[in-house]
Design a protein with these regions (language model features):
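Terminal alpha-helical segments
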Residues: 1-165
Length: 165
């Protein structure tokens, strides 16, 4: 199973993929939210591998390791909630369902730029927490999402795409 650094390397690779999707694929908010979530998945799996030498394959086991009083990989409540929200935004993007997993609706819930902003805010919070905890750094990723304009995040910056005329 992958160790700490392998998960961090994959998270960084996924950040580069997020940047490329944002730059080259128009109106791809769903894929950007989903990619953001998988950056978070690898960061959390890196943390669990380092703190508890555990290697999980299900999202439920990961969440249990992150917020169980007896777990050596337990994280603070806000980071745990941010990870859960990021997961729910990804579910919405992948399955067109409501972010609230308990709500049922026949309506398709489309992912928009505002959802990417929320996903990046949650992911940024997770990255800040884990960078400090594990003394690591992540690259800053430029994202063209008007909803980010005026927002201050450590690892994500609004940058409008260049338009070739």
């Amino acid at each position: 199973m992958a160790e700490f650094q392998a998960h961090i390397n994959q998270a960084v690779k996924n950040l580069a993929t997020l940047s490329k999707i944002n730059q080259f694929i128009e109106d791809s908010w769903d894929w950007q939210v989903t990619t953001s979530y998988y950056v978070g998945v690898h960061i959390m799996n890196a943390h669990i591998a380092k703190m508890a030498n555990l290697h999980y394959t299900t999202h439920d086991k990961v969440k249990n390791a992150l917020y169980n009083q007896l777990s050596p990989a337990k994280i603070d409540q806000q980071t745990y909630l941010d990870y859960g929200k990021l997961e729910n935004l990804s579910r919405r993007a992948r399955y067109l369902c409501n972010e609230n997993s308990k709500a049922e609706s026949p309506v398709a819930f489309i992912t928009h730029d505002v959802h990417l902003k929320r996903a990046l805010e949650k992911l940024d919070s997770i990255m800040v927490y884990m960078a400090k905890l594990h003394s690591i750094t992540f690259p800053v990723t430029n994202i063209d999402c008007i909803e980010l304009k005026g927002t201050t995040l450590q690892y994500f910056k609004y940058q409008q795409k260049r338009v070739n005329i």
